[in-house]
């Protein structure tokens, strides 16, 4: 007895007929198409076994139905773009939706790398430094007067030059005597510690921190021998080419403050009138 070879669904014999295998089960063409064939997005008909099924994102088309929604040109084996469930050839998509390059004014095609800045777009090769004309790409850049500059060109053309190291000042900086300095270059002439944000003074146009200035140039107190800075409202007494801090201007014997009082001198000492009676 001959073994049966029937359609898995309708059980009609498949001897001498076309059939399709699915998951190792045979189906007649009619059953296969009714059960498994995709429906064409364009014409709404089934895509039969004798037709090529073109698919994109779970959507299916007959080969003859796979065309641009705008110009109706075939998209088979061609690049295309999707917009609001419509398929468009690259030309139609560019005319309808693509941004225009700020430099060359041509469309920026789908899939093309582009640069965007403040609502404008450029082809990657059109986004160039205004000075050296080289593509900026993903490097840092600085806008100036509606033009874009790579950092080295901007620094050469616009950045202030530090009076100390002669290099560009790109961020921050300090102005002293109407000249620009890097913060790290503006240092005490003596100890080289940074002066930015610190109190300092100058002598012969050279800047010094208060400590170095006092050590080098300040007069010494005749009482404690420490420097008298004279800065920041420091009060001191001066008498016969000698100086004292206010707190140090005291009677040598009784330590009474002599600020605003009469006093006597005994060699290098100063005395209050009472202690001076015995001289």
Curated annotation (Swiss-Prot):
Sites bearing Phosphoserine, chain numbering: 238
Cross-link for Glycyl lysine isopeptide (Lys-Gly) (interchain with G-Cter in SUMO2), residue positions: 78, 167, 220
GO BP, sorted A to Z: negative regulation of apoptotic process; negative regulation of calcineurin-NFAT signaling cascade; negative regulation of transcription by RNA polymerase II
Protein's cellular compartments: Cytoplasm; Nucleus; Cytoplasm, Myofibril, Sarcomere, Z line
This protein's record includes keyword Ubl conjugation: yes
Gene3D superfamilies, alphabetized: Cysteine Rich Protein (2.10.110.10)
Claim: Nucleus is one of the keywords in the record: yes
Domain LIM zinc-binding span(s) in chain numbering: 40-92, 101-153, 162-212, 221-275
Gene Ontology cellular-component terms listed: nucleus; Z disc
UniProt keyword terms in alphabetical order: Cytoplasm, Isopeptide bond, LIM domain, Metal-binding, Nucleus, Phosphoprotein, Repeat, Transcription, Transcription regulation, Ubl conjugation, Zinc, Zinc-finger
Task of the protein: May function as a molecular transmitter linking various signaling pathways to transcriptional regulation. Negatively regulates the transcriptional repressor E4F1 and may function in cell growth. Inhibits the transcriptional activity of FOXO1 and its apoptotic function by enhancing the interaction of FOXO1 with SIRT1 and FOXO1 deacetylation. Negatively regulates the calcineurin/NFAT signaling pathway in cardiomyocytes.
UniProt comment concerning the protein's domains: The third LIM zinc-binding mediates interaction with E4F1.
Binding partners and assembly: Interacts with ZNF638 and TTN/titin. Interacts with E4F1. Interacts with GRB7. Interacts with SIRT1 and FOXO1. Interacts with CEFIP and calcineurin. Interacts with FOXK1.
Name this protein carries in UniProt: Four and a half LIM domains protein 2
Organism: Bos taurus (Bovine)
Originating gene: FHL2
